Each structure stands twice: as structure tokens, then as C-alpha cells.
Amino acid sequence: MQPEGLILVVAVGLDVRLQPAGPIGRKIFNNNYTGMHMSDALFSSLVAAPADPILGVTQRYRQDPRPQKVNLGVGAYMTDEGVTPVLDVVKEAETALAEACIPHSYLPISGLDGYGAHVQQMVFGADSEIVLSGRAATIQTLGGTGALKVGMDFMFHICGERVASTSLPTWGNHNAILGMAGYEIKPYRYYDASTNSLNFDAMVEDLKALPAKTLVVLHSCCHNPTGYDLNEEQWKVVIEICQKGGLTPFLDMAYQGFRDGLDEDATAIRMFAASGMSFLVATSFSKSFNLYNERIGALTVVCQSKTEADIVMTQLKAVVRCNYSNPPAHGAYIVERVLSDPQKYAHWKQELGGMRERIRSMRKALADEMARLGAKRDFSFVTRQAGMFSFTGLTPEQVEKLAVDYGIYAVKNGRICICGLNTRNVEYVAKSIAEVL
């Protein structure tokens, strides 16, 4: 006998239909599903999601048949030849892995054994009190995005934080992940479009106005998209505001090594560590190792004691288990081999330094060319920004004109990836920008 009120799913050949069970079920069916196919009932009201504002740029670029075109949208490092290189240290590690023929068994939920310890040493320094005391929990994640997702879910669902604050502007996925988790987002001002510079006074004012237990997302270096970073004195002010206001800092470190060097770029994080606060760090190795498709990152939660960190680790694993269960191994093996070997680590720092210097040279080349052309705006600010990106101040209309008339593709908000520039296209890009100003 069928229970009253059920709507049964019935397969008829290759067709799937809804069928009522009993009088109550028939009433529900007649009121809601009459004349509808099952797929109509489930998905017919959906509308297409908008294209990703960053990845959509690359899609448009690829569809452009013109031979002279430039992709300044996606944030990936490229050589002067326009390719994303495989680092020598990565080649060596992959060769060793192939020879070792390691079984493809599951990794632990927290990731590859030893990986977290070496990540902590890179982030905080090998002699850091945090590392030596064991009062931080580090878990391997699916890139930096995965670290943000796990950390934001942990703080919302486990720790009960309901308000988050991100810089205005910020990387778009910050707000998307926070919104999906359920946070109310209160942005803090960061960038002054009228002067194309950091607006620190406004940032301080907005941070001071945030309620206690607000998760504050901070860019530790190479701010995305503006390229403007805080100096040490400004970081001291931010740390004091977080301490007095009971705010929870979440530092996103996607570009360690791309501003001044691995240790130099960890300055802000090490200042937070010295303050004694509890905070979170998202680390990405996508850029620094050019391992974009391996999805290798880490989430670190700094606690007040080892006992507290051990408990936090159990909760982080619970978040991961009901999400993706456990992380992939290949990228972790590569990164762990390099971080754990002083000689390989030094080689990696050298290769990373080469990438950093190429980006700097392209910043200077763009600024110099804009000056030579006598552009309507002074573009010297590009050399004062750091990292892969420059916030150009171009309007959405100017960005669209670059794409349509010149085959130069950038993010709608005016962000360009400096890595897309090279010695063959920088003059063309500068000339095109000058013409749309």
C-alpha cells in the first residue's frame, strides 16, 4: 500500500514521469505538476549564471580570430614568449616522483604528511614561536580558493561568525565565497580612484566601524586587483584595530614571493603572529610554482595553544570531509619535496625571483611607453604597484573599446595582468590604451 501524499518518480522506457499516489498525492500533483515533465518541474525556471568576470575574458580572447590580440585578463604568469613555464624544480620533482612510482592511494583528510609543517615554516619562518609551539593547524587545500572556502565555512558554521569585510575593490571570488556561506558583507574602502592610490584613512575609518567577530579579509601582499600594499606602519595600525575591535583577520597570501621575496612578503603575517592574535592564512602555490591546474594550497589557523590547534584541526577535517573528502596528491608531493630540501628551496627562490623581475620590467616598460606617447594620463603609478596586476583606472567603456577595436582583453573593472605583457606587445598595448583614454 502506497502512503498518502507521495509523488512517485516513474520510469517509462527512456522517459521519466511524475505519478501521484493516493487522493492527497493526486491533489498535490494536480495543483503543482499537471502537464509537466519531471525536468520541467526541477529546472525550467532556472536562468543561466553570468560568465565569470575574469575567466570570461579568456573565453572572449580565444574566440577572437584576429592575429594581433592580447590577453590581459587571467592571472597566470607567462614568459616573454607568452607561455606559462614549468619550473626546473618542478621538472626535477616530477622526474623523481615518476621513478618512485608512488601508489595512488588516498591522502589523509588534512593532506600529505609533512606538507603542513613545511608550509608553516615558509609562512612564519622556521624559528617562529608559532611553529615551535605547535599552536597552528595547517590543512592542505584545493589551491588558495579552497583555503578560503574551507576557512570561511569553518568560521561561519563552526565558530558562528556572521559578518565579513573585504576591501573595496577585492578579488571577486572573495565576496562570492562569503555570500555562498551566508555572511553579511560590509566592505571597507581601500582604493581612491580619483588619485589612483591607496586610501588608508578611509580603510581605518571603516575597519573601526565593524562589529566584533567580523571576519576581515586582508591581502598580505600584491593586493588583487589594485597592486597597492600597506607598509609596516600601516599594518601596525590595522593589527591594533583588529585587536581592540575583536575582529578576526583572514590573510589571503596568493602571491608570496612576487613583491620583494618569500620572507619579505610574509612581513604582514609575521607581524600578526607576533601580536599574539588568533587569525587565519590562505596560501596558494598556483602562482609561485606555476602549478595552476594542480590545485595546491593550504589553510592555516593560528590558535592560542597546541591543544586549541589540535581541536581546530578536527573541525577543519570535518569541513573538508563533507566537501571534497581529501585533497589530490601530485601537487603536494612536488611542493613538499621543494620546501623540505634546502638546495631545492634555494633553486625555487631563484626561479621565483626571475619571474618577479620580469613583471617589474614590464611595469617599467608600460609606464615608459605611455610617457613617450604623451598619454593624457600619467601612468607612472604602474611602477608603484606590486604583483601580477595593475588597476589602470580604465572605465568599463574603455575596456570594451580596447577589446572591440584593438583585440586587447582586460577585466571590466580596469584590472590588467602585467604578465600578459611582453617585449613584442607592450608598445601596441600602450598605444592602444593611450588612444582610448
Show which residues each predicted segment covers.
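Structural signature of PLP-dependent enzymes
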Residues: 313-331, 338-367
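Cationic, low-complexity basic patches in intrinsically disordered or flexible, solvent-exposed regions
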Residues: 3, 20
